[in-house]
Swiss-Prot record:
<keyword id="KW-1133">Transmembrane helix</keyword>
<keyword id="KW-0472">Membrane</keyword>
<protein>
    <recommendedName>
        <fullName>Uncharacterized protein A118R</fullName>
    </recommendedName>
</protein>
<feature type="transmembrane region" description="Helical">
    <location>
        <begin position="40"/>
        <end position="57"/>
    </location>
</feature>
<feature type="transmembrane region" description="Helical">
    <location>
        <begin position="5"/>
        <end position="25"/>
    </location>
</feature>
<keyword id="KW-0812">Transmembrane</keyword>
<dbReference type="GO" id="GO:0016020">
    <property type="term" value="C:membrane"/>
</dbReference>
<keyword id="KW-0426">Late protein</keyword>
Length: 118
């Protein structure tokens, strides 16, 4: 930690008006208090993100698999898969929200493919 002289200098730079000694002494304490609060909030944020990642890791893998299906199974001219088969697989491995989202993406993809090859 820095000395009081350092904080007196900082206080003189930040607050050019004359300060009473009690204010000069309280400034390092306030800075130290805020540093500790920021460190604690950073710790809580990291803990929160860690718990989210651990809790939803299976769902994240599931969505990665959905991306895999979207990229490889829905491209009918190459892989010969029908759109309905791919959506049926997705409904089995994912929840209803992801299936609806993917179905709309697949429909848009199907429209783009049809327009491209016409």
């Amino acid at each position: 930690m820095h000395s009081n002289a350092f904080f007196n200098l900082i206080a003189c730079v930040l607050f050019p008006t004359p300060l009473i000694p009690s204010m000069v002494i309280s400034i390092p304490r306030m800075i130290n208090k805020w540093v500790k609060r920021v460190q604690f909030l950073t710790f809580l944020t990291n803990l929160f993100l860690y718990n989210i990642v651990q809790h939803y890791i299976n769902r994240i893998r599931c969505y990665s698999f959905i991306k895999y299906l979207l990229l490889y199974n829905l491209y009918r001219p190459i892989f010969g898969r029908s759109l309905q088969m791919a959506i049926t697989k997705i409904k089995i491995i994912s929840d209803a929200t992801a299936a609806v989202l993917l179905k709309s993406c697949a429909a848009m993809y199907d429209v783009l493919i049809d327009k491209k090859f016409k």
